[in-house]
């Protein structure tokens, strides 16, 4: 019983540490390209996004301070791999959510993620 409790505590600590780790922007993609893609995909129709012209949407969460968030999509640790997966196919991650299919390639999603990680 004690071993199970300790293992559970260790697992919880590892998940917490992973969620709190902040990725290096250079490890994700190109932030400048990501900003352009965000504009093209009209993400600002739903989200308020600092640094993106006319990105003042109110139906999605505002993305100011995105890099400081520990959780994305209400349930995922804020890691580059989780963010890229979410950007590529949000319905696969959380079926029925309001985020539309972005039609981003893996490389494009990495670039968008790089931009989002500049938002502190």
Where are these regions (language model features)?
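Sec-dependent bacterial lipoprotein signal peptides
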Residues: 1-20
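Axial heme c-ligation environment in periplasmic c-type cytochrome domains
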Residues: 45, 57-66, 86-116
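Stable alpha-helical elements in mature extracytoplasmic
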Residues: 30, 42, 79, 83, ...
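Electrostatic cytochrome c docking/interface patches
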Residues: 20-39
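Detector for the c-type heme attachment site
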Residues: 21-25, 46-53, 68, 88
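Short, solvent-exposed mixed-charge patches
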Residues: 119-120
